[in-house]
Amino acid sequence: MLSVWLRVIRVRFLLASVIAVSVGLALTWRQNSSIDPLDAILIFAGVMALHASVDLLNDFWDFKRGIDTKTKRTKMSGGTGVLPEGLLKPSSVYRAGITFLIIGSVIGSYFVITHGIIIGIILGFAILSIYFYSTKIVDSGLGEFFVAVKGSLIVIGTFFIQSGEITIESILGGIVVGVLSSLVLFIASFPDHDADKSKGRKSLVIAVGKEKAAKLFWIFPLISYITIIIGVSANLFPLVSLITLVTIPLMIKSGLGLRKNFDSIENLVPFMSSTLMFSRITGALFVVSFLIVL
């Protein structure tokens, strides 16, 4: 039963939020040479709870709307398959999603009390967007934008809780992380195009079509790379942050693979996986770059 719950929560995709929090903490460490360990633990717990919540509620609503019964599931797309396979009751998944949302909100409320209105604004955005993500947000074509903003706010919020300020470094760091996370959602939406479109969902891929969308792939990594280069050039990021550029070959492999196989689910799966690897490795190297003392 535990394995089923871990599957529906999409544990391996939680790494995106782990990286986002880690970037915020690493930026704080580079600036102040210290972090508050208790606050760091609470931030991780709160962010993980909110991330689990959005995945659970997304699985619930996709099943209720009949999307997951029409998609061809892969390890990267098409939902978790838990509800279509009858492994859990929809009501149980919904209640779990709300429970995690409450847990994350309670932890976030603590930081609102201790750190003020800025965290309150971030928390309010998180709660509303999580609850309405699988209905209002994705139906309006804002899924990729939401994920990018979510990742950015995790970095900014973490840094603010630890340092008491919002800096250009934290904003740029947030952009890097947010766009990398958005890229994973973007490429994973290709196999779900037909099912999503038939049920009224919208995405960037649906808006412009698969062929044109495949050409937009490059925009995401370019934004992240350019942001890092700007940060290094402006002395906001350490020179060693350029280590993230070692993932360029993986990015090129993924982009070319998408361009060639955007309309073939089976052939696209390896390139969805390599895109996930690109995003996570680039993010992890970005974190490490702030911890290396040269």
Predicted features and spans:
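Topogenic membrane-insertion module of multi-pass membrane proteins
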Residues: 1-42, 46, 138-145
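Intramembrane alpha-helical segments
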Residues: 4, 79-168
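Small-residue-rich segments of transmembrane alpha-helices in multi-pass membrane proteins
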Residues: 18-24, 146-160, 206-210, 273-286
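Membrane-embedded alpha-helical segments that form the functional core of polytopic membrane enzymes
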Residues: 23, 33-57, 120-131, 169-187
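Helix-coil boundary and interhelical linker segments in multi-pass alpha-helical membrane proteins
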Residues: 25-45, 105-120, 155-175, 226-240, ...
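Acidic (Asp/Glu-rich) catalytic motifs at the cytosolic membrane interface
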Residues: 49-74, 183-205
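Multi-pass membrane catalytic core of lipid/isoprenoid biosynthesis enzymes
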Residues: 71-112, 205-237, 276-280
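Extended hydrophobic alpha-helices typical of membrane-associated regions
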Residues: 233-294
